[in-house]
Amino acid sequence: MSEPTPAIEIKDLVYAYGRAEAVHGLNLTVPAGCCYGLFGRNGAGKTTTMKCLLNLLRPQRGSVRLFGLDPAKHDVEVKRRLAYVPDYVAFYPWMTVRETLDYLASFRSHWNRDTESNLLDRFQLDPGKRTDALSKGQRTQVALVAAICPEPPLLLLDEPTSGLDPIVRREFIETVIGAYQEGDPGKRTILVSTHLISEFEGLIDEFTIMDGGHDVLTLGADQARGRYQKIRARFAGSVPQAEFPGALHIKRNGRELELIANGGGPEIIEKLRALSPESLSSEALTLEEVFVATLK
């Protein structure tokens, strides 16, 4: 049996602005039906990658495929199957929210009006308000409504919570994304580009960390939590001088020792136990902590 076609497949992608390479040899595969995180600091190359997927930029080397299709050759067919929310949203300023959504719905073969009504209520958006009177956060909310109502197979989100207050961010993450994926389990895919990793912790299935245009780490979320550990030991006296092969980072503070382990946690714990600490504990890293440890 052949492997299912990924929602997104990027191979050896390169894109430069003049002499400055924004993306350098990026490889990334997003299986259909998952919520995939593209993590990186500002300037890591995330938005350039998104623009290549949307055919707003053409890869200078390498390739991108969505549902097995080259967006440069199948632009309309690909765009019918996705929705995109950028980090900055602009609408026709003279239109109301209602007119804007009706206008955008006219380009779609399907539009879930029940979902639209529900989201407008949840976001407390006034359909009669002109878009030029909306705050940045409200414009983002309208864009999210417009992205989710067509119920596309693929949702591309570039810093989607930018400009939203903490309460609305939580509402968006817990309710909106959840509702989108629950509508057609296994078929709806999300690629979310963000540096606010903790906010998406419970939704991400797999992720890639980008730095300087490169993919530096790709893992399943559960795999990352099982591999990366934070180990703490407290001693009666000063921290013994010892080597800990496999520790990514070591921090000594008085009588306390903290280590970040990547796959070597059990061996490090046994070595620490032999040093007779007063206390010894370990816990899985969050995805944000994995991100920080990887780029530190």
Where are these regions (language model features)?
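ABC transporter nucleotide-binding domain
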Residues: 171-265
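C-terminal coupling/interaction segments
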Residues: 260-296
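Catalytic Walker B motif of ABC-type/P-loop ATPase nucleotide-binding domains
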Residues: 155-159, 164
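Conserved structural motif at the start of ABC-family nucleotide-binding domains
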Residues: 8, 23-25, 79
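ABC-family P-loop ATPase nucleotide-binding domains
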Residues: 76, 80, 86-142
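A short, proline-enriched helix->beta-strand linker immediately N-terminal to the Walker B motif
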Residues: 149-153
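Conserved ABC transporter NBD signature motif
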Residues: 62-73, 77-78
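The feature captures the beta-strand-to-loop junction immediately N-terminal to the Walker
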Residues: 39-41
